[in-house]
Amino acid sequence: MLNSIKVGFIVLLTLFTSLNVQAAGGIALGATRVIYPSAAKQTSLAISNSDTQERYLVNSWIENNAGQKEKTFIVTPPLFVSEPKSENTLRIIYAGQPLPGDRESLFWMNVKAIPSVDKSHIEGKNVLQLAILSRIKLFVRPANLPQTPEDAPTLLKFSRVGNHLKITNPSAYYLTLVNISVGAKKIDNVMIAPKSDMQIPLPTGAQGNVTFQSVNDYGALTSATTASLG
């Protein structure tokens, strides 16, 4: 799924002889995306540690769509220790200039979990310690948009431009489309920005209606929708 959590592995520490590997598998986010109402002073994201023994150092920050750290957001606490079998809440505060009021704005929430190290267990060993980076979408959503997020996928327009499928999104929402097909031909998942269009190469022999699903605010797939190819 295009909008599932992106996970990256970072090599943090290498020591001496035999090899052990540790991974931060106990940390989980409470959502696959964050919706931040623009009129709200803040929003939140739950983080849980399901591990019965492991502690993790958790570092959180927000990036813009270009992958640069976004200084207009404050995440508190930006750095904390997650104890075994515990839950914590990150507060996310936007402190920048007003964002566009006629459409959503996209950012990326990053949460890196680094497992603790017992030095007595690794002395004289070669240890490869892995951190897990969870990266999910953060949408800043203005109030009083003309459509609901549930209705937005029904407004999409599809047309053929040469050997490409053109998708037009007139709505105010970012839309993630998955399980796309033209007739019997499958097409890669895409995300299309508000009030924009994009073109996707069509597989050879693609004919017929367009069928797709979208991802809702809770990270779940909507029912399949079929649209004519204009």
From Swiss-Prot:
Q: Name the Gene3D superfamilies on file.
A: Immunoglobulins
Which parts of the chain span the membrane according to its record? Answer: none
**MF terms (GO), sorted A to Z:** protein folding chaperone
User: Record's GO cellular component, any one?
Assistant: outer membrane-bounded periplasmic space
* Compartments, as annotated in UniProt: Periplasm
Task: Write down the InterPro entries for this protein, in alphabetical order.
Answer: Ig-like_fold, PapD-like_sf, Periplasmic_pilus_chap, Pili_assmbl_chap_C_dom_sf, Pili_assmbl_chaperone_bac, Pili_assmbl_chaperone_C, Pili_assmbl_chaperone_CS, Pili_assmbl_chaperone_N
- SUPFAM superfamilies the record matches: PapD-like (SSF49354), Periplasmic chaperone C-domain (SSF49584)
Q: Which GO terms describe its biological process?
A: cell wall organization; chaperone-mediated protein folding
- Stretch forming the signal peptide: 1-23
Return the Pfam families for the record.
Answer: PapD_C (PF02753), PapD_N (PF00345)
* Family classification: Belongs to the periplasmic pilus chaperone family.
The function of this protein is: Required for the biogenesis of type 1 fimbriae. Binds and interact with FimH.
Annotated protein name in UniProt: Chaperone protein FimC
Q: In the record, what lineage is assigned to the organism producing the protein?
A: Bacteria, Pseudomonadati, Pseudomonadota, Gammaproteobacteria, Enterobacterales
